[in-house]
């Protein structure tokens, strides 16, 4: 009863959060419709082979052959038994709410836990949760299907709450909350978001250090820091399997350093992606105004013709052109929407810079500025280059614009701190109303100037990419077209500027009414919460709305099998690959749902495979398409041996070709090398550059090239005139069995992707695999008849699973200990009373 009396407001807030989360998705959640997300749909194709294997065996495979000719599942479908119980705890935390609904609920609840850890009043904590959770980017990524990113962002505030509790002297609670939500966070499996928020933690810890120095509480600071590190370590260890294998895979993936030394060395980084790739999605400097005005650059890359405000200004003679243009005119390649933190929220943030007096203010300001500067990427290369070259792990991640998630955290946090100061120090408000008016001028005032004279402050409303696309239009049409297009976009921009002014005027009026005792604090907080919710809700509905929801059957039904798929699947051979030339081969996973694909989509594919795509596979695809079309599909007229040897060594048995009317046709490749073959000769080279160059200069059916590090394993292959046979007799994604016979023995090349962790046995005896032709497995086999088994069951998985299980047991003991101590504390308190 006492517990209910103490926490009933918290319970009401949690129920309110659930109601708000449900309400956002009305009527879709009532109708039973679900969100169709591109990335989630793509993931289904990538995971179909894994799901089928699990249904058949009850086991998870760590390898899949469905995309990119084969890759580990560490990043496509990480699943470990050690975190099964943790997953159930996470479901309890989400209250078992449906997908999409619980995403928003977790946003809200996580920030509420953080603000309560800061000891905010409950109504202020609820307000802060709303203005954080409804930041536009958090809804845009739900629409896009970036679900792991959603999870990671939802668990970061409560993880930081553990840090706050520790530095407030609540060591046991700090340890538990840090450990639990670090475990949640790491399991969310989006290292980039976690990494970015470590900058926030860094600045916050500096703020606590400054406080400790001022108050001479060094022992407390050291103890709290130790508690945080211990909690984080425990949460990390609970996810040992996931973290270790993510790290291991990272070295082999596009996130790792290439072994190739390229001519354009300035574009390379010391340990990660290339600079151009890292900064491809960089926020524009002028685009930063979207924090205040969502349509500062037009919003999302959706058809311009769908914007009513713009079309009111459209000249009918240019309608055909406008149907081809998007609303967005920034310099990113494209965007699903802007980063908008709320107009009045931003004003409160600026007000907080004046009236909040704690070191934490400076920590939040520093983190905000850093995130904005880094989000500019290629538009501010001095700082970007410094971080790429000298800050550990920064070069591992692309899409630098997403670092604005830091600002989306720090801005609402300082905004609600400002409100807390206004409420707790009302006399200070009366004496410093000038800061309210200054903040008003820096936000609403600026937005009003933009609205009145947009062209005075922004030089162009047409992107560089659009200028390139329009340059072929005759000059007599181009000039009036550009003038009209500018008018249309100025209208869009001005409308949102006025909207921003309106929101801030209402919010400022509430502060003034509170200043003159016309509103009570609680009432003001509730109205501000409603104002910010309505503001951000309306903006978010532009990018995540009911029109995006479909009947559940549309998403959950198995993709429709085409006639081409049916024909190919009649081939009951155990293992072969398919190259879909009728699709965007390396940007789709639909092919992977039914076939073992040469292509696929994943942002962290194996680096060596990506380099083979760039050097050989992509050029061969173009030549192959042209040759087959020229031959009218008659493969006897296609010189497949010389046109596409790399595709042959990858066991590409079928090509899917495009036909008119969105139809396709399968073409059997008679030149494929099959599952495995003996080679006459292996040439050893000194480095990756020599190896990848040599691949294109030898007869891959009879020769192989390998790095000299594998010479001990592969030895010499002198199999000329060798009568040999290699037959695949058993297939599973993670286990392949071959019968081999040969007169002389030698090196067998398998049409399978090499990756550390694959093991080999010959007649039950361990054998050492080597890597040949830059990406394939190979094995030296003696003459005679043998049985070869290749298996992928890394010992590292078993080791890390043991560590994770023990660590989770420690967490459960910690939970039990705190529960016991709290019970004992309450019991003693009742006895005293």
Annotated model-derived regions:
Residues 129, 145-156, 166-183, 191-193, ...:
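Contiguous transmembrane helix-bundle modules in multi-pass membrane proteins
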Residues 9-46, 231-245, 370-373, 446-451, ...:
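Transmembrane signal-anchor helices characteristic of membrane glycosylation enzymes that use polyprenol
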Residues 115-134, 172-175:
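Transmembrane-helix signature of polytopic, membrane-embedded enzymes
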Residues 18-114, 130-153, 267-341, 374-384, ...:
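Membrane-interface coil-to-helix junctions
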Residues 223-283:
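Polar, glycine-rich mid-to-C-terminal structural blocks
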Residues 102-119, 345-347, 414, 508:
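Transmembrane-helix motifs of polytopic, lipid-linked glycan transferases
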Residues 347, 653, 662, 698-833:
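Active-site-proximal, structured, solvent-exposed surfaces of multi-pass membrane proteins
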């Amino acid at each position: 009863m006492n517990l209910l009396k103490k926490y009933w407001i918290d319970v009401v807030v949690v129920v309110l959060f659930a109601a708000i989360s449900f309400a956002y998705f009305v009527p879709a959640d009532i109708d039973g419709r679900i969100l169709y997300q591109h990335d989630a749909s793509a993931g289904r194709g990538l995971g179909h082979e894994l799901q089928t294997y699990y249904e058949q065996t009850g086991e998870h495979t760590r390898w899949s052959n469905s995309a990119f000719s084969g890759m580990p599942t560490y990043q496509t479908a990480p699943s470990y038994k050690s975190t099964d119980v943790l997953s159930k705890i996470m479901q309890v935390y989400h209250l078992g709410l449906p997908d999409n609904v619980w995403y928003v609920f977790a946003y809200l609840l996580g920030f509420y836990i953080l603000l309560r850890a800061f000891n905010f009043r409950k109504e202020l904590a609820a307000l802060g949760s709303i203005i954080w959770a409804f930041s536009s980017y958090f809804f845009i990524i739900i629409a896009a299907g970036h679900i792991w990113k959603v999870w990671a962002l939802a668990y970061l505030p409560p993880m930081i709450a553990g840090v706050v509790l520790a530095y407030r002297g609540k060591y046991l609670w700090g340890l538990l909350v840090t450990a639990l939500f670090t475990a949640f966070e790491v399991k969310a499996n989006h290292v980039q978001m976690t990494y970015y928020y470590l900058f926030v933690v860094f600045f916050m810890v500096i703020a606590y250090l400054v406080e400790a120095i001022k108050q001479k509480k060094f022992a407390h600071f050291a103890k709290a820091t130790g508690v945080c590190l211990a909690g984080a370590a425990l949460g990390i260890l609970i996810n040992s399997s996931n973290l270790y294998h993510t790290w291991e895979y990272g070295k082999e993936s596009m996130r790792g350093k290439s072994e190739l030394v390229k001519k354009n060395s300035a574009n390379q980084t010391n340990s990660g992606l290339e600079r151009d790739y890292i900064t491809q999605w960089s926020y524009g400097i002028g685009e930063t105004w979207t924090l205040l005005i969502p349509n500062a650059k037009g919003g999302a890359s959706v058809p311009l013709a769908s914007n009513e405000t713009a079309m009111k200004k459209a000249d009918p003679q240019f309608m055909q052109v406008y149907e081809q243009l998007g609303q967005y005119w920034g310099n990113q390649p494209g965007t699903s929407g802007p980063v908008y933190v709320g107009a009045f929220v931003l004003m409160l943030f600026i007000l907080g810079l004046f009236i909040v007096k704690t070191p934490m203010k400076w920590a939040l300001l520093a983190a905000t500025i850093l995130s904005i500067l880094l989000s500019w990427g290629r538009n501010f290369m001095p700082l970007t280059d410094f971080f790429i070259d000298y800050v550990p792990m920064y070069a591992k991640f692309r899409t630098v614009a997403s670092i604005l998630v830091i600002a989306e955290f720090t801005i609402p946090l300082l905004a609600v701190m400002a409100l807390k100061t206004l409420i707790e120090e009302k006399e200070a408000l009366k004496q410093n109303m000038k800061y309210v008016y200054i903040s008003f001028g820096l936000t609403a005032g600026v937005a009003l100037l933009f609205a009145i004279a947009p062209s005075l402050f922004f030089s162009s409303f047409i992107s560089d990419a659009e200028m390139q696309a329009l340059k072929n239009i005759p000059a007599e049409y181009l000039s009036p077209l550009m003038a009209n297009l500018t008018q249309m976009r100025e209208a869009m921009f001005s409308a949102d500027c006025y909207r921003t002014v309106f929101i801030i005027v209402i919010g400022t009026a509430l502060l003034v009414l509170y200043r003159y005792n016309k509103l009570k604090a609680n009432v003001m907080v509730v109205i501000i919460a409603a104002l910010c919710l309505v503001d951000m809700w309306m903006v978010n509905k532009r990018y995540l709305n009911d029109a995006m929801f479909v009947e559940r059957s549309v998403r959950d039904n198995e993709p429709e099998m085409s006639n081409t798929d049916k024909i190919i699947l009649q081939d009951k051979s155990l293992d072969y690959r398919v190259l879909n030339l009728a699709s965007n081969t390396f940007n789709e996973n639909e092919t992977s749902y039914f076939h073992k694909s040469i292509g696929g989509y994943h942002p962290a594919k194996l680096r060596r495979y990506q380099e083979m795509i760039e050097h050989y596979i992509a050029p061969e695809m173009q030549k192959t398409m042209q040759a087959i079309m020229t031959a009218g599909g008659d493969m006897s007229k296609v010189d497949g041996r010389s046109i596409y040897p790399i595709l042959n060594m990858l066991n590409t048995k079928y090509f899917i070709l495009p036909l008119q009317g969105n139809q396709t046709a399968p073409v059997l490749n008679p030149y494929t090398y099959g599952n495995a073959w003996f080679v006459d000769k292996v040439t050893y080279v000194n480095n990756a550059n020599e190896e990848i160059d040599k691949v294109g200069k030898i007869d891959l059916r009879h020769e192989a090239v390998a790095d000299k590090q594998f010479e001990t394993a592969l030895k010499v292959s002198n199999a000329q005139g060798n009568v040999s046979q290699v037959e695949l007799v058993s297939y599973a994604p993670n286990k392949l069995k071959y019968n081999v016979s040969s007169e002389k023995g030698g090196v067998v090349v398998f049409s399978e992707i090499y990756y550390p962790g694959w093991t080999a046995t010959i007649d039950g005896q361990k054998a050492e695999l080597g890597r040949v032709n830059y990406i394939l497995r190979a094995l030296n086999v003696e003459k005679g008849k043998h049985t070869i088994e290749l298996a992928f069951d890394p010992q590292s998985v078993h080791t890390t699973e043991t560590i994770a299980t023990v660590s989770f047991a420690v967490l459960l003991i910690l939970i039990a200990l705190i529960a016991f101590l709290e019970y004992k504390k309450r019991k003693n308190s009742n006895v005293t009373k």
